[in-house]
Structures are given as C-alpha cells and as structure tokens.
Amino acid sequence: AVAYVTMALRIAWYKVHRPAAYYCAYYTVRADCFDASILGGTQEAIRGRYKEMEENSKDLTQKDKDLMIIMELVIEMLCRGIKLAPVDLYKSDATKFQVVDEKTIRMPFNALPGLGEAAAQSIVDAREQSPFISIEDLRNRTKISASLIDLLREGGCLGGLPESNQTTLFSF
C-alpha cells in the first residue's frame, strides 16, 4: 500500500509542478486513444464533441470511452493554459509527445488517426537522413501510401512542400 501512495504522490507532484511533462507522459502512454483530428481543435470544439459522445453514451465503443477520458484531460490542460502544437513533419517524434516549452506540447505522428507506429517511424528515419524536397520525395523515401499522405496533408503537416520533385521554369 505504501508503494501505491508513494507513486500517487509522485504523479500528483508532476501534475502540479511540471504539468507539461505530466501531460506528455500521460498522452504518450495512451497514444493509441489519442485523436489529433478531434483533440487538436479548440476547447469549445472538444467540449462540443464530448457532449455529443456523452448524449450517445449507450452506443459508444470502448475506444470512444477511452477517447472521452483523454478529452477530459485535454480540456483540463487547455484550462491550465497549456496548448497542443500540431504534428510537424520536421519536429514531431514518431510516438512520443514532446514538451516544446512550459505552455506547449507537440503531438507525435501517431496521434493522427490511421497513421501507425511503423509509418510514423519511417517518416522520422527518412527525415533524419535529409530534408524532404517534395511530397513525392516523402512518399518514395518512406514508402507510405497515398492515403497516409492525404492524412498528413489534412493534419497540416506538409506545409509548403511541393507535390513533385520537378521544378518549373516559373517556380523561382
């Protein structure tokens, strides 16, 4: 019993004194339940989605119930002034949430729904070799599918990457 109390005190200490680190650890452990398309929005949008799910609580799957728990924690985190930075092609980790600063946490690639751990790791491995010059280069070097490219595009990860490796005469 002493071990459980000691662990609870440690967790509580981190939640109060190092909240960004606490939330990073919590979300990383439960990354399979995290959905960046929902949780990366505004506090009002997350609350609205939470209320929708609460109203249909009889029809929820276990994954939806787990997502609701994460939603509660994200809302709490946002109320404490800590925000989620979007997935970034050059800064995000494959599976771990990262503390950017005391008030910002960056989401990993696998926070995007449908982007698995293997695909996320292949993106990280490829970007460590050299920067991506285009979406075509990203796809060729990582071997990820067109649907995952679309997922990255929807998540805002591709920024200003051109579609093709070829440059045009007027692109300068």
Language-model regions: role of each:
Residues 1-172:
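Noncatalytic, beta-rich nucleic-acid-contacting surfaces in large DNA/RNA-processing enzymes
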